[in-house]
Amino acid sequence: MRHEYSNLKIFAQGGDAIKAAEILRGEIESRTGAMPQMTDSGKADISLIADPNGLRDGYKIEQSGSRLVFRARGIRGLIFAIGMFLRKIEVSGEKITLIQDIGGEYKPDKRIRGHQLGYRTTPNSYDAWDLEDYRRYYLDLMFFGCNTVEHIPYDGLGAQQNRLMKYDPQDFLVEASRIADEYDLDVSLWYPNDRESLEDAEKRRRRVFERTPRINVMFPPGGDPGDYDADEFISRCRDFSRL
């Protein structure tokens, strides 16, 4: 069934829900030119609820006609719910049409759903991005259910500041991680095992880890670069896991 909205009204309960509501309001304004108003729960078309007993990596949508309630433990699940809504609407001027019912409980099949987007000179485009471009990309990924972004620490990988790549890569990583943390978006670091002493490798990693606000995963590729035998590779990974 299709449901139409004009002058969309939103209610939010809980700190993360208020943050998520601001994201939803911004997305609607960018599509319609009209900023939805905040209201109380009895008048809201969409209510966002931060529920301590809700899903962290999923969400519930309760639907009664055109009225919707998005429910999740925190901002991550609420952003996922917003993404579902945005993917199922059509916009014409200021009119929004939900093209199908979307009520239900949504849980991911895969625990890790990530994308690598390290700030460096080797990509074709996003070395020219700034932090707000990354914020935009993070949200776009989360609207489709992504829960992890993977960055690449700068360890002499050839990244140099220039007229396109304006920021220090390591400083950029720190701030990009901070933005990810605002959205409860997991951060993975792609960190290869190069030919260097364990002591030097630990020092380099410790410097990065101490500066970076959020790190959930360190991913050490088995090669390209790195050519350790399996036993030594695993041993070094275990040492790094204790940092």
Annotate each PLM feature:
Residues 109-243:
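Aromatic-lined carbohydrate-binding surfaces of glycoside hydrolases
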Residues 1-110:
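Contiguous, structured surface segment used for ligand recognition
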